[in-house]
Amino acid sequence: MARDYYAILGVERDATDNEIKKAYRKLARKYHPDVNDTEEAAEKFSKISIAQEVLLDAEKRRIVDMGGDPMAQGGGDAGYGAGGGLGDIFEAFFGGGGGSRGPRSRVQPGSDALLRTTLTLEEAYLGTKKPITIDTAILCDRCEGTGSKSKSKPNVCSTCNGSGEIQQMQRSFLGNVMTSSPCPTCRGTGEVIPDPCDKCGGDGRVRTQRDLIVNVPAGIADGMRIRMAGQGEVGPGGGPAGDLYIEVMMQQHPVFQREGNDLHMSVHVPMVDAALGATTSVESLSGDAIDFEIPAGVQPAETIVIEGKGMPQLRGEGFGNMIAHVDVSIPTQLDEKSKELLNKLRDHRSDESSVRTADDSDDSLFGRLRNRFRR
């Protein structure tokens, strides 16, 4: 039967590498032979070491997730050296680990940047070119990213002899241990610039403000991001720039409310137009007038769908719909002529009484309440 390596470390099956390492270190502090010399602890430490090795290896972990046991397929037992052992113990307590990692490159990739910009619904409908200003790091034009006044190559750090690390002996409950930490002189790169640029201080980059133009595609929606490749910050030592992301925030529109690619609006219909029908219009986001019909007998809260007059499909073809929500306006003040006409209408339709029994149809208010309580 395959061993449950997740259970051995006490982690979930979707645990990240960092979560696996953290669980291993926690158990290693308890079961390492230097702190617990029992046979049971030695066996437990061997198991957690093997479990860490397996779960940190992508191929072995895949076998485990398929129900197999990679250590039963010629993998053997890892013992104390599997997946870290003492090195991980040292790292857990002293931060630098027990072994040398070597110098890191002085030239590093730049960071991505995020900027938020506000758009009107009209701009999102038509697409636009949006000017922005960002505070960012750019390549130093004086040293061209080398960090050196003379643009010469850096020298080997004399403090760490190019290793990027310094080592020192520390006492612990494990005895005397040799720990490594980044060299403070070269900051872990193993190199120093003998004549730092007086503009960037040897960093190879300077901070400045840049003006850019963002191409906003038609149909973009609130919360979406536009990626501008290579427009982020230049990295230390003149490393390649990261990307710039522009996050869109939409202003509230006085007429339309967007849902997906549909545009919703409220249309106020006079009582007479609701009864007889009418033609009305609304100004679209492009500035054109859109005419549409109010059908005779339309009721309050009914919707009228105007096909193809909504938002454009982002990077595609077609448009959403415009949806008008009917609000029938009942007059509150009437002149004598209007009262006379309405009284004549009421007399003409005298067979319609305002006193009604409760409508018991399924579509009525009482019908809906009845059906709900029957559930």
Swiss-Prot record:
Amino-acid positions noted as binding Zn(2+) 2 in the UniProt annotation, renumbered to this chain: C157, C160, C183, C186
Name of protein: Chaperone protein DnaJ 1
Pfam families: DnaJ, DnaJ_C, DnaJ_CXXCXGXG
Domain of life: Bacteria
Family matches, as NCBIfam families: DnaJ_bact, PRK10767.1, PRK14278.1
Cofactor section: Zn(2+)
UniProt-listed InterPro entries: DnaJ (IPR012724), DnaJ_C (IPR002939), DnaJ_domain (IPR001623), HSP40/DnaJ_pept-bd (IPR008971), HSP_DnaJ_Cys-rich_dom (IPR001305), HSP_DnaJ_Cys-rich_dom_sf (IPR036410), J_dom_sf (IPR036869)
Subunit field text: Homodimer.
Alphabetically ordered keywords of this record: Chaperone, Cytoplasm, DNA replication, Metal-binding, Repeat, Stress response, Zinc, Zinc-finger
Zn finger intervals (CR-type): 127-209
Taxonomic classification: Bacteria, Bacillati, Actinomycetota, Actinomycetes, Mycobacteriales
PANTHER family with a match to the protein in the record: CHAPERONE PROTEIN DNAJ, DNAJ HOMOLOG 1, MITOCHONDRIAL-RELATED
Binding note for cofactor: Binds 2 Zn(2+) ions per monomer.
Record remark: domains: The J domain is necessary and sufficient to stimulate DnaK ATPase activity. Zinc center 1 plays an important role in the autonomous, DnaK-independent chaperone activity of DnaJ. Zinc center 2 is essential for interaction with DnaK and for DnaJ activity.
Organism: Corynebacterium diphtheriae (strain ATCC 700971 / NCTC 13129 / Biotype gravis)
Family designation: Belongs to the DnaJ family.
Mapped CXXCXGXG motif repeat ranges: 140-147, 157-164, 183-190, 197-204
GO molecular function: ATP binding; heat shock protein binding; unfolded protein binding; zinc ion binding
One GO cellular component, as annotated: cytoplasm
HAMAP family listed in its UniProt record: DnaJ (MF_01152)
Physiological role: Participates actively in the response to hyperosmotic and heat shock by preventing the aggregation of stress-denatured proteins and by disaggregating proteins, also in an autonomous, DnaK-independent fashion. Unfolded proteins bind initially to DnaJ; upon interaction with the DnaJ-bound protein, DnaK hydrolyzes its bound ATP, resulting in the formation of a stable complex. GrpE releases ADP from DnaK; ATP binding to DnaK triggers the release of the substrate protein, thus completing the reaction cycle.
Domain J: residue ranges: 4-68
Positions bound to Zn(2+) 1: C140, C143, C197, C200
Subcellular location, record wording: Cytoplasm
GO biological process: chaperone cofactor-dependent protein refolding; DNA replication; protein refolding; response to heat
